[in-house]
């Protein structure tokens, strides 16, 4: 007979190769057909809610690796929560207003000057919806489970209406005001910017030291001195109205040749060196506070420069005398306001100097630096000119430098509720913990929030003006505008006259003739997304405010985390979130930022097309995402190898359970052998460890625990020795059914544990598992760890066995290299262990030659009794020899019982018995 036909080899139709790029889209179609999102929500209905609120990505272009990292992390959490006793809805969102969309249309050749604002905005909306559709399909391809048919989109009328309500609530509480104040201004975007829209890049600037002659010394100075200021923005000098000194600093009057200069005493040496002074001597010192109200002359205009006191003056750089232009700096503005200076800002929206800067009008601010410096030299006021490279704020979208410029803007007064903001930060759980300090410091130090933008594509600021110029924001007007937006969308603001946007019959004492005009500015996009707690969490029945978790990149401390906190605390007095989790950025394999110029951009689509979504997801689980993370072909190759091991483990388990019926063949735990129960202890340890890691969002710990379990506990040990029983014994042999019982528990638990990370693969495995009834593994719960009564004793004993086994494996490896044996089944081993290990070995009832995968096993004496040439290891000496006998044709064990059964001459006694009992009729 053909003995190979009597072996119970693994049998399964579960494919060895993942072929994920083809198989995953088919799985996603299946999910769509069965409405998996709705099914999970139905299955978890009535459980406590866990709400992870999606920070809306910007709807422009394909998704990048940062998007993929973010959405996959969120998906891990939502999937895990829905399998551990929660109802975890996930509503995706998109941020759809703002400059990039306007620019995209301009780049496509849209002639916006030839159309009305309303017409241009319609094109913006169409473009935004196209981008949403494009990104939605890409996110779905990642395997992200979400309410994709009902996302929130910031341009939708219902959303905009709620945003107007948030604005109205803040205005009613007195938190919204209009004021002239220096704001970050982008000449290239022709709009104000919020702090969140700024990034710092290196820039080369002129660095100049300028002398301002004293005009009136107020009996403190003699009048022949000169203040020295230092600046890197010569173009702001036409706007200079003063000089700030620190009240507590000591200032020196320094005589250099025939000139006398005023600088901070502690900067004397630095300034003297920079200006190359020789024989300079300090002739007098005065306290900064004494210099208040002295007057200097502007270097090239017939104008005074008032000396004022300011706490913002430092001795980190410069001279301790600070050039002050209230129209071009926040500190300058504050000091100037205190001293009653006008807010002079001789620069227009495009960054061009106006006639308020005589001699330089019509010049772009950056181009004005040179002629201004030349003018200073001409009048003898320029003491030094060099060039420096320093970190300077740039527009995050156009990548061009920005300026500080005083304009009339709408602000949200943070000062009015800063204390509540700081309390809300303290009450929130931050992961990583440094997030709390970061946001606390930002909130503590931030100025009022400039919320107006001079653009077309955004939510209008719902303010009307009376004939006398008074702004009008009342409950009545806000509610009416919100209703109009809900019905028609915010475009109605640009399609109708002010009177048609006001409630019928509306009157105001400031408009005796019934004439009104409307605000033309729109809101900062951070106000859009920052209102999502109201427009989404509060408005949708399936969600709740505060959310349990906000999870975004670390750039969102100054962005969405901040704006959401500001609007939520302003409106509700509380944070919109209970917890905040942040992740780092995705870098290339060498730790460099991805950029087109380097050509190192890794695109999610390419990874999914070549390797599959589950490989990308497994990579996300493998990295320490709280810091910046790296990705490259080599890194992905390693991850794909780990995936292959996990997949092969599933295939092996399924293959060996082909004839296992859980309802009929399961062996009771009490009847399992010790080694099988030990495997269950290891499985329960895995379940506990993995669930704890999911709970603390430590996905790398999940990844490593599952990988180690598959390779070390299963492949290298349990599955390795189990083959001799699974393949060789008869189908119903008690040891075989015992091992299958363990394998079945392992398979079901492992499939569930990997589901949040590898949903495609888990749902591919699921229907192959004998006896499962659920349509998808996503409709099940995480496995529960079952504590065996003798778990600790089993662990102590069998962990010791595993360390001893390592010694045996080393000895077998040496014997193989020395050609004593071929494979381990050729071996006969004799062990000479330590006393402790000897006792342990004697207490094992299992067949030790099976556990060591050798043909013969003997226990010799103690370690010290071992032959002198026997290699000694930590726990035992091992003598390895060639086993005596012949090799069994069926089980490959070397045995002296071969041919004892005349009917089966090439089989060992054990195999002959198995064949007779199971295969001979």
Curated annotation (Swiss-Prot):
Belongs to the class-I aminoacyl-tRNA synthetase family. IleS type 1 subfamily. Catalyzes the attachment of isoleucine to tRNA(Ile). As IleRS can inadvertently accommodate and process structurally similar amino acids such as valine, to avoid such errors it has two additional distinct tRNA(Ile)-dependent editing activities. One activity is designated as 'pretransfer' editing and involves the hydrolysis of activated Val-AMP. The other activity is designated 'posttransfer' editing and involves deacylation of mischarged Val-tRNA(Ile). ATP binds at residue 596. Its cofactor is Zn(2+). Its EC number is 6.1.1.5. A motif ('KMSKS' region) lies at residues 593-597. One of its GO terms (molecular function) is isoleucine-tRNA ligase activity. L-isoleucyl-5'-AMP binds at residue 552. Keywords: Aminoacyl-tRNA synthetase, ATP-binding, Cytoplasm, Ligase, Metal-binding, Nucleotide-binding, Protein biosynthesis, Zinc. Its main location: cytoplasm. One of its GO terms (cellular component) is cytosol. This is Isoleucine--tRNA ligase. It is an enzyme of class 6 (ligase). One of its GO terms (biological process) is isoleucyl-tRNA aminoacylation. PANTHER family: ISOLEUCINE--TRNA LIGASE, MITOCHONDRIAL, SOLEUCYL-TRNA SYNTHETASE. A motif ('HIGH' region) lies at residues 57-67. Monomer. HAMAP family: Ile_tRNA_synth_type1. InterPro entries: aa-tRNA-synth_I_CS, aa-tRNA-synth_Ia, Anticodon_Ile_BEm, Ile-tRNA-ligase, Ile-tRNA-ligase_type1, Ile-tRNA_ligase, M/V/L/I-tRNA-synth_anticd-bd, Rossmann-like_a/b/a_fold. Binds 1 zinc ion per subunit. Zn(2+) binds at residues 888, 891, 908, 911. PROSITE patterns: AA_TRNA_LIGASE_I (PS00178). It is found in: Cytoplasm. NCBIfam families: ileS (TIGR00392). IleRS has two distinct active sites: one for aminoacylation and one for editing. The misactivated valine is translocated from the active site to the editing site, which sterically excludes the correctly activated isoleucine. The single editing site contains two valyl binding pockets, one specific for each substrate (Val-AMP or Val-tRNA(Ile)). It catalyses: tRNA(Ile) + L-isoleucine + ATP = L-isoleucyl-tRNA(Ile) + AMP + diphosphate.
């Amino acid at each position: 007979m053909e003995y190979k036909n009597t072996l119970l080899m693994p049998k399964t139709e579960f494919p060895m190769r993942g072929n994920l790029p083809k198989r995953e889209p088919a799985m996603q179609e299946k999910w769509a057909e069965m409405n998996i999102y709705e099914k999970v929500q139905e299955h978890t209905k009535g459980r406590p809610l866990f709400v992870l609120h999606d920070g809306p990505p910007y709807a422009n272009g394909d998704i990048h690796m940062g998007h993929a990292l973010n959405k996959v992390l969120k998906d891990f959490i939502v999937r895990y929560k829905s399998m551990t006793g929660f109802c975890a809805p996930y509503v995706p969102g998109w941020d759809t207003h703002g400059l990039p969309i306007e620019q995209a249309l301009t780049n496509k050749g849209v002639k916006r000057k030839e159309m009305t604002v309303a017409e241009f905005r319609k094109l913006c909306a169409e473009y935004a919806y196209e981008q949403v559709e494009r990104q939605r399909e890409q996110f779905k391809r990642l395997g992200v489970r979400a309410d994709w048919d009902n996302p929130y989109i910031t341009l939708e009328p219902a959303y905009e209406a709620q945003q107007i309500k948030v604005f109205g609530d803040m205005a009613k509480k007195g938190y919204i005001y209009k004021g002239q104040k220096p704001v970050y201004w982008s000449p290239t975007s022709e709009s104000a910017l919020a702090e969140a829209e700024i990034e710092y890049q290196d820039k080369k600037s002129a660095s100049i030291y300028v002398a301002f002659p004293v005009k009136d010394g107020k009996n403190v100075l003699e009048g022949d001195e000169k203040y020295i200021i230092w600046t890197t923005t010569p173009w702001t000098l036409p706007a200079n109205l003063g000089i700030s000194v620190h009240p507590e600093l000591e200032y020196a009057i320094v005589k250099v040749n025939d000139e006398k200069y005023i600088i901070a005493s502690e900067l004397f040496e630095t300034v003297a060196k920079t200006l190359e002074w020789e024989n300079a001597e300090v002739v007098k010192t005065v306290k900064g506070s004494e210099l208040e109200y002295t007057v200097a002359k502007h270097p090239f205009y017939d104008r005074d420069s008032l000396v004022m006191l300011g706490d913002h003056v430092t001795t980190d750089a410069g001279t301790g005398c600070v050039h002050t232009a209230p129209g071009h700096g926040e500190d300058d503005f504050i000091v100037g306001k205190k001293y009653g200076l006008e807010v002079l800002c001789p620069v227009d929206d495009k960054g061009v100097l106006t006639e308020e800067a005589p001699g330089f009008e019509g010049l772009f601010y950056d181009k004005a630096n040179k002629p201004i410096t030349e003018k200073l030299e001409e009048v003898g006021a320029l003491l030094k000119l060099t060039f420096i490279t320093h970190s300077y704020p740039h527009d995050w979208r156009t990548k061009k430098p920005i300026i500080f410029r005083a304009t009339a803007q709408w602000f949200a007064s943070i000062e009015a509720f800063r204390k509540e903001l700081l309390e809300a930060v303290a009450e929130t759980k931050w992961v990583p913990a440094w997030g709390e300090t970061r946001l606390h410091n930002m909130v503590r130090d931030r100025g009022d929030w400039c919320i107006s933008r001079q653009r077309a594509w955004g939510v209008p600021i719902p303010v009307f003006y009376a004939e006398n110029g008074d702004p009008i924001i009342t409950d009545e007007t806000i509610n009416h505008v919100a209703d109009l937006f809900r019905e028609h969308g915010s475009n109605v603001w640009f399609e109708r006259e002010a009177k048609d946007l006001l409630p019928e019959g509306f009157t105001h004492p400031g408009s005796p003739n019934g004439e009104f005009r409307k605000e033309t500015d729109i809101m900062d996009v951070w106000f859009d997304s920052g209102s999502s707690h109201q427009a989404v969490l509060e408005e949708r029945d399936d969600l709740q405010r505060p959310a349990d978790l906000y999870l975004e990149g670390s750039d969102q401390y100054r962005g969405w985390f901040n704006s959401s906190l500001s609007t939520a605390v302003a409106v509700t007095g509380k944070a919109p979130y209970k917890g905040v989790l942040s992740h780092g950025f995705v870098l290339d394999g060498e730790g460099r930022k991805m950029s087109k110029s380097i050509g190192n951009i890794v695109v999610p689509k390419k990874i999914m097309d070549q390797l599959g979504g589950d490989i990308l997801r497994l990579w996300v689980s493998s990295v320490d995402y709280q810091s910046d993370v790296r990705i490259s072909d080599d890194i992905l190759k390693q991850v794909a190898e780990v995936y292959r091991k996990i997949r092969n483990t599933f295939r092996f388990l399924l293959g060996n359970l082909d004839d296992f019926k859980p309802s009929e063949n399961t062996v009771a735990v009490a009847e399992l052998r010790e080694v099988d129960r030990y495997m269950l202890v290891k499985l329960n340890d895995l379940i506990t460890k993995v669930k704890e890691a999911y709970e603390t969002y430590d996905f790398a710990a999940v990844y490593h625990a599952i990988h180690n379990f598959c390779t070390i506990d299963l492949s290298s040990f349990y599955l390795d020795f189990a083959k001799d029983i699974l393949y060789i014994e008869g189908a119903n042999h008690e040891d075989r059914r015992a091992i299958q019982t363990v394998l079945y528990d392992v398979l079901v638990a492992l499939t569930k544990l990997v589901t949040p990370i590898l949903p495609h693969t888990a749902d591919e495995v699921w229907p192959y598992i004998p006896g499962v009834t659920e349509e998808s593994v996503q409709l099940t719960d995480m496995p529960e760890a079952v504590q065996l009564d003798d778990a600790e004793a089993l662990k102590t004993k069998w962990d010791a066995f595993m360390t001893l086994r390592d010694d045996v494996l080393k000895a077998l490896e040496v014997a193989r290299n020395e050609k004593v044996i071929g494979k381990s089944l050729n071996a006969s081993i004799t062990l000479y262990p330590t006393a402790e290990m000897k006792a342990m070995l004697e207490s094992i009832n299992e067949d030790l030659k099976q556990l060591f995968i050798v043909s013969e096993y003997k226990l010799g004496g103690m370690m010290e009794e071992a032959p002198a040439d026997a290699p000694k290891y930590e726990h035992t000496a091992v003598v390895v020899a060639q086993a005596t006998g012949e090799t069994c044709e069926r089980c490959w064990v070397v045995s002296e019982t071969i041919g004892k059964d005349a009917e089966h001459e090439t089989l060992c006694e054990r195999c002959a018995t198995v064949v007779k009992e199971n295969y001979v009729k």
